[in-house]
Amino acid sequence: MAVANFLNEAKSQGNKLFLQFGGQGSPWLKELSKLYESEPSLKEFFETAFKTLAEEIPSLDKKIVSQGYDFESWLKSPDSAPDESYLSSASVSIVGIFLTQTANYVSLTNKGFATSELLANALGATGHSQGIVPAVLVSLGKEGAEFYKEFSKFLKFILYLGYRAQELYGVFNPSEEVLKGNEEIGDKQPAPMVAVIGYSAAELSERVQKTNTDLGLSGTKAIYVSLFNTPDSNIVSGDPEALLAFRKKFKAEMDEKKVKFVYLRTTAPFHCPIMDGTENTVPKDMERIGFQYKGSDLKIPVYSIFDGRNFQNEPDVSLPLFREVLIKALHWDKATANFVNTPKVVGIDFGPSVVSQKLTQANLGSSENKIYSASSPKDIKVLLA
């Protein structure tokens, strides 16, 4: 297979690559359906995915995944898929997003971006929230049958991250009081996570802490700044009742300062201590499926979304990976610092959609580095030119 012109140009100009993967909150079914329909080279990828999911479905509680994980039927006939509220639920979307971004990666490796070439020229990799999981998968450097063996394990792992998170939190069903309270102040579709756009991280943290103190909230009842995305766009996680109280407390100020308050399409509060209880379930799942990796298994640096450290230096990668997706706060500036601060680096984002690409662009500042998205038709033309 010929090496893509984009890669050859990067090498000739002395540019390194940075690989990144998106996180929750992105629509995925349309993008994944298009890959399923239009990419014959992904036949083995989808067959492996469907077989892997079928192995786990019988042991799952129907209360958590009431309409199952019938991705094969949904992709063959998108019109027959469940409604958006089910597809965006934490236990389902985490799987759909992982499949979409990994399919984008595999598709690109079949078009002149062979794994060996990508990794040989990579500065490193990371992923926004759950995107750190495929970043580790890719960094193993596996190809062919060896890749699909690992892919199957990673798919089971991410399935259980979403499933156990929802199991712990319970099926999301906001009370009439919460629905009415949000409606009265003009907010829609309450959720356990909300984007607050317009406060600095320090300003938001101060207001979150004041809310917890004034209302006597602590532990699983408190609210937390859970994802520090850009200088003025961050996420707060917590019970919808507490998030509503936070919103009411500062709504006048938010309106005055034009601060946006937008609920995410998800059904569990990730990246905060409310998920501490998954320590009792996920490690057992990991042991059962054989999900165990060391830092020395990684062929390129994978940067932590909590503190930016290189996972290659970790004796164990598996447990930190679980904790970074479910429990620990995300600091996107730390995860992408090496990309932002190293000259002559080109980023490739594997989606889904362009959300994580835009988050990274917002942190580039004066850097001249560029990042292209495999989910963007315009950017794909550049990558495959």
Regions found by a protein language model. Give the residues of each.
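Gly/Ala-rich beta-loop-alpha elbow adjacent to hydrolase catalytic centers
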Residues: 101, 123-131, 135
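Conserved SAM-binding loop
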Residues: 126-127, 235-236, 349
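Gly/Ser/Thr-rich beta-alpha loop segments that engage phosphate groups in nucleotides
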Residues: 24-27, 129, 133, 240, ...
